[in-house]
Amino acid sequence: MYTSKQPFLKSKQPFSKSKQTFNKSKQPFRKSKQTFRKFKQPFRKSKQPFRRRPRIGPGDRIDYRNMSLINRFISEQGKILSRRINRLTLKQQRLITLAIKQARILSFLPFRNYENEKQFQAQSISIITGSRPRKNRHIPQLTQKYNSNRNLRNNNQNLRNNNRNLSSDC
């Protein structure tokens, strides 16, 4: 049954300003009512276009003998790829890691892929031994000051050591 709103009942006591104290500092600041309101809707990401197919299908068995599956999760150097790169769940990553380790122990997989590792090392060496810019022979004042302070410290250290040696000889 629908009940209508009850009418506002006036209090029997008369309103007196002297009894109530009005303290502005304790009152929270209220903005005036706005005539136009915007209703904000929460931002929802649509998962449809960004949906990626999982790397492990529902029928794939994570086993040390399933080499085609295991090879997807190993880098060119033979290292196990991280979860972030693989996009696997924790449980899947754990099972893959165990399968890779078991395959290595049973010599289905090498511990390292030496062919690709040699290529990788050759590239890194060529980058390091490439043409280097000439060092500037001009030494800034700060470096000279630092070197002179270091020389003074070394000299003082040597003097202290000599004094100790002389006192221990006596």
UniProtKB/Swiss-Prot annotation:
Residues 13-26 have a biased composition (Polar residues). GO terms for molecular function: small ribosomal subunit rRNA binding; structural constituent of ribosome. Sequence repeats lie at residues 4-10, 11-17, 18-24, 25-31, 32-38, 39-45, 46-52. InterPro entries: Ribosomal_bS18, Ribosomal_bS18_CS, Ribosomal_bS18_sf. One of its GO terms (cellular component) is chloroplast. Residues 1-61, 149-170 are annotated as: Disordered. It is found in: Plastid, Chloroplast. Pfam families: Ribosomal_S18 (PF01084). Its main location: plastid. Residues 27-55 have a biased composition (Basic residues). Residues 4-52 are annotated as: 7 X 7 AA tandem repeats. One of its GO terms (biological process) is translation. Belongs to the bacterial ribosomal protein bS18 family. NCBIfam families: S18. Part of the 30S ribosomal subunit. This is Small ribosomal subunit protein bS18c.
